[in-house]
Amino acid sequence: MALLGVNVDHVATIRQARGTNEPDPVTAAALAELAGADGITIHLREDRRHIQDRDVELIRQTVKTRLNLEMAATDEMVGIALKVRPDAVTLVPEKRKELTTEGGLNVALLRQTLKKHIDLLKQGGISVSLFIDPDLEQVKASHRIGADAIEIHTGAYCDAACAATRSKELDKLTNAVKAGNKLGLLVHAGHGLTYFNIQPVAAIGGIREFNIGHSIISRAVLVGMDRAVREMKDLVGGA
């Protein structure tokens, strides 16, 4: 059964919109765990637009499952990770003007820089995942430079405008998952997944973990964190 990592970034987004102390993503992370989340994901962006350094430190201290820290592959972020010691790091591309992460890392192009950071993180006892598009060359490149895991970007599947395109993107996801498994990589998936589109991806098999944020937090606003997490966990595990 696949695991569910709950991303609480958007709780911090609401807080930062008013410049106040609430809602607190630290509390949201605890509630998600109580509802059955298998892990907590947070993205400390270079511009600190939502998650702040204090959030990372406090969630690290209070999380009872496992903490996955998403971050750019920079010296600053690697230093923070080595200090805070999350259970896992997911390296992602960042653009200052993007609303959310727009695509996967070009591992083949950035292999030297990424390998340097991967080696440092692994020496610090931190598992490293790379956020990549469902492209077989990127899967192979991730394996070659020593990643422990890959997180496959599901955005193109989620944004597909018609059934034919969606089916094509689902095939790409399936092939990337199979390739990752064959190479011995842990395979995760995320980005744009909702209560309405998760099941075909969960049915692929071979995906160890789904990291989902916006959809869960959006539903939690209406029905509460407990119900929102439990409903998504049922979909992830019961496909």
UniProtKB/Swiss-Prot annotation:
Keyword Transferase: yes
Location(s) in or outside the cell: Cytoplasm
GO MF annotation list: pyridoxine 5'-phosphate synthase activity
Enzyme class: transferase
Principal localisation: cytoplasm
Keyword terms, alphabetized: Cytoplasm, Pyridoxine biosynthesis, Transferase
A GO CC term attached to the entry: cytosol
Annotated pathway: Cofactor biosynthesis; pyridoxine 5'-phosphate biosynthesis; pyridoxine 5'-phosphate from D-erythrose 4-phosphate: step 5/5
Domain of life: Bacteria
EC code: 2.6.99.2
Catalytic site positions: H43, E70, H191
Site label Transition state stabilizer, positions: E151
Catalytic activity: 3-amino-2-oxopropyl phosphate + 1-deoxy-D-xylulose 5-phosphate = pyridoxine 5'-phosphate + phosphate + 2 H2O + H(+)
CDD domains found in the cross-reference section: PNPsynthase
Binding site for 3-amino-2-oxopropyl phosphate: N7, R18, G192, G213, H214
Record flagged with keyword Cytoplasm: yes
Binding residues for 1-deoxy-D-xylulose 5-phosphate: D9, H10, R45, H50, T100
NCBIfam families: pdxJ, PRK05265.1-1, PRK05265.1-3, PRK05265.1-5
Function: Catalyzes the complicated ring closure reaction between the two acyclic compounds 1-deoxy-D-xylulose-5-phosphate (DXP) and 3-amino-2-oxopropyl phosphate (1-amino-acetone-3-phosphate or AAP) to form pyridoxine 5'-phosphate (PNP) and inorganic phosphate.
Subunit structure and binding partners: Homooctamer; tetramer of dimers.
Family: Belongs to the PNP synthase family.
PANTHER family: PYRIDOXINE 5'-PHOSPHATE SYNTHASE (PTHR30456:SF0)
Protein name stated in the entry: Pyridoxine 5'-phosphate synthase
Gene (UniProt): pdxJ
